[in-house]
Amino acid sequence: MNSLPPAEGLAAVIAEAMYQVVHAAQFGRARDALIGQYSARKREEAASPLVRHGAKYFSQNDEDGILLEILRRLGLASGVFAELGVGNGLENNSLILLMHGWKGIWLGGEALAFEVPARGPLHFQQAWITRENCRALVAQGLAALDQQHVDVLSVDVDGNDLYVLRELLAARYSPRVVVVEYNGKFPPPVRWTMPYDPEHIWDGTDYSGASLQALADMLQEFGYRLVACNLTGSNAFFVRVADAGKFADVPADVGALFMKAEYIVMHPGHQTSPKTIASFLATQA
């Protein structure tokens, strides 16, 4: 039978363990402080003033605050959104709009972490999104809500984003705001797009999506201009050229607005509970 160590030896082990715990906590606080300082400096130095409004409520990073400021400038207090690629529904770009009284469509291949009431402001359809079916899926969602147009369109399908977005714009959906994930590995003027693959599943590498320049070029063909990229270099925000006057303080150069991929610059905050979203939707049904 193993014998217990002497009391003084056990005390030393406990003291060392406590030291390591305290040291780890101090290191964590110091790390968070440095990240916070770096993020604040990066936000202030951003070419687009919209980035300084960045804030995380339900988005993955700071997209919520940027989107709300864009909508404020456009004078859009309510409307209709369509988001393609919503994960389990707990973290995306349009949940904040739902909280502000908007109606909208969610499409994605993953089941939601909560139930969506049959009658309410949100229509969800679980489906694998491709270039071939995205038009029909959005049309079905709008019909379910008895709506005819989309004010905010967000696309994050982890691969075929440019192709799906181009298909929807070609279908004459002309949202006031487009939010789309870009590949922050490729700075402008690099033009790169993943070859179209309707069966593509993101493997966690940089083989995904399209460069910011490729997306900006495509969206320009449909009358849109870039106004911001979020702090982590994940999502780009576009508005109609007709609304450019409301963003006169934003430079037109895509390279100046580009944010490289830096996912460490945002603190995750409190995790969203499915109960929070479910309880809100229950009040809207």
Pin down the residues of each PLM region.
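SAM cofactor-binding core of SAM-dependent methyltransferases
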Residues: 51-144, 148-155, 184-187, 269
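Conserved acidic-Pro-Pro-aromatic motif
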Residues: 80-83, 96, 116, 122, ...
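Short amphipathic alpha-helical segments, especially helix-boundary/capping motifs
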Residues: 39-46, 69, 188-193
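Short, hydrophobic/amphipathic alpha-helical patches that form generic packing surfaces
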Residues: 32-33, 69, 96, 218
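Short, functional N-terminal and low-complexity linear motifs
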Residues: 30-38, 104-106, 181-186
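Membrane-proximal basic amphipathic "stem/tether" segments
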Residues: 1-51, 285
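General secondary-structure edge motif
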Residues: 46-50, 77, 199
